[in-house]
């Protein structure tokens, strides 16, 4: 069972990397796999948030600047650290400072998000999107911005979960929830924390935005989680991708393979007609013949007379005449269209030369069509 837990944790890590890269489908696939291996709370929490809010991922790409935050945080709260200077080392405005202080002074999660206690899912999503972008430590360098960002993430993660929201409402405020964490009813807070990290939640909403090489560590009560915005490919992931990649390539090539097979089969099944309206040395159809009814000329090979006699010959000659009439009719239509176009152009541009040229068109195919029509009527 412990072996399954290790594999499940690997799947969760791969899912988090996928979220950082904005690949929600891959993250969801690995989280579902982790759930089958071992029931990790973090996997369940991530999966629930993705299923509820994943459709928004990837719609709001953002560019992250390398963060140098290293603010000293409160016990059991967010710690955002890199090898650079602290949050105060970068520029920030008075409005950002006031906003951070306002968030950190809030006593309950409803105040944090600025919503009422009867707020629905859409209200929570709207409030979270607005605040998460405003207080993300890579955009807001005011002291305490990391704590505020974490608090906003925890607020949404708890209030968007019906069960956790119901139990949270029993405590009245955040501090009471923290004080009651040893009580079995409130152990879902894990020391005032949700089962999903603030950065994971942000990546689900914004499709792995703010890509960079910076590292953010968020403490979730009993254990910390470090995210590196770089591609870390494990052997487990590569093996999974190879399997999926091979199958997906096969699926993509399937229509082409089917098309080739159908083309080959049709060539094998459909034989060349025993005649041609024009001499074709490649097929040996060079012997000239003429239909008995309309006198249409066609060409056959040397074995034709031995193979086609009587009724068979009549069927062939009927097909010859039908093909010939169809060709003549099409060519006549083209001739008429050409003549009409030339006459119209001559009228528009008042060009007598073009008008005379249009009148001089021979219309050979139309004359032949008239001859064939008279033969049909006469027959």
From Swiss-Prot:
Cytoplasmic membrane side: 1-244
Gene3D superfamilies (alphabetical): DnaJ domain
Molecular function, one GO term: Hsp70 protein binding
Keyword Cell cycle: no
Membrane topology category: Single-pass membrane protein
Keyword S-adenosyl-L-methionine: no
GO cellular component, one term: endoplasmic reticulum
Lumenal topological intervals: 266-379
Skewed-composition ranges (Polar residues): 69-84
Residue intervals of the J domain: 108-172
Transmembrane regions: 245-265
Subunit note: Interacts (via J domain) with HSPA8/Hsc70. Forms a multiprotein complex, at least composed of DNAJB12, DNAJB14, HSPA8/Hsc70 and SGTA; interaction with DNAJB14 and HSPA8/Hsc70 is direct.
Family: Belongs to the DnaJ family. DNAJB12/DNAJB14 subfamily.
Function: Acts as a co-chaperone with HSPA8/Hsc70; required to promote protein folding and trafficking, prevent aggregation of client proteins, and promote unfolded proteins to endoplasmic reticulum-associated degradation (ERAD) pathway. Acts by determining HSPA8/Hsc70's ATPase and polypeptide-binding activities. Can also act independently of HSPA8/Hsc70: together with DNAJB12, acts as a chaperone that promotes maturation of potassium channels KCND2 and KCNH2 by stabilizing nascent channel subunits and assembling them into tetramers. (Microbial infection) In case of infection by polyomavirus, involved in the virus endoplasmic reticulum membrane penetration and infection.
Name assigned to this protein: DnaJ homolog subfamily B member 14
């Amino acid at each position: 069972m412990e072996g399954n837990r290790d594999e499940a944790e690997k799947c969760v890590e791969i899912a988090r990397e996928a979220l950082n890269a904005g690949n929600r489908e891959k993250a969801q696939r690995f989280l579902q796999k982790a759930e089958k291996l071992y029931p990790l709370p973090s996997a369940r929490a991530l999966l629930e948030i993705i299923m509820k809010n994943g459709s928004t991922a990837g719609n709001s790409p953002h560019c992250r600047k390398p963060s140098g935050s290293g603010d000293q945080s409160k016990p059991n709260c967010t710690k955002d650290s890199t090898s650079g200077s602290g949050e105060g080392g970068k520029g920030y405005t008075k409005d950002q400072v006031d906003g951070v202080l306002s968030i950190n002074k809030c006593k309950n999660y409803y105040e944090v998000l600025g919503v009422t206690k009867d707020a629905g899912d859409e209200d929570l999503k709207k409030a979270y999107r607005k605040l998460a972008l405003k207080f993300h430590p890579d955009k807001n360098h005011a002291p305490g911005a990391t704590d505020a960002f974490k608090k906003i993430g925890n607020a949404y993660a708890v209030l968007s979960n019906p069960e956790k929201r119901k139990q949270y409402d029993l405590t009245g405020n955040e501090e009471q929830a923290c004080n009651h964490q040893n009580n079995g009813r409130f152990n879902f807070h894990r020391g005032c924390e949700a089962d999903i990290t603030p950065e994971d939640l942000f990546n689900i909403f914004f499709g792995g935005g703010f890509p960079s090489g910076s590292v953010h560590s968020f403490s979730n009560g009993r254990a910390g989680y470090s995210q590196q915005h770089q591609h870390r490919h494990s052997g487990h992931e590569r093996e999974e991708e190879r399997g999926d990649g091979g199958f997906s390539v096969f699926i993509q090539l399937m229509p082409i393979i089917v098309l080739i097979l159908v083309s080959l089969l049709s060539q094998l099944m459909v034989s060349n007609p025993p005649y041609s309206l024009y001499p074709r040395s490649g097929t040996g159809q060079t012997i000239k013949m003429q239909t008995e009814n309309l006198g249409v000329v066609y060409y056959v090979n040397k074995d034709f007379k031995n193979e086609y006699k009587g009724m068979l010959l009549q069927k062939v000659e009927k097909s010859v005449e039908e093909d010939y009439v169809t060709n003549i009719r099409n060519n006549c239509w083209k001739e008429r269209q050409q003549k009409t176009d030339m006459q119209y152009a001559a009228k528009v541009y008042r060009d007598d030369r073009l008008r005379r040229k249009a009148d001089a068109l021979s219309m050979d195919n139309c004359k032949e069509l008239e001859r064939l029509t008279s033969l049909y009527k006469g027959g």
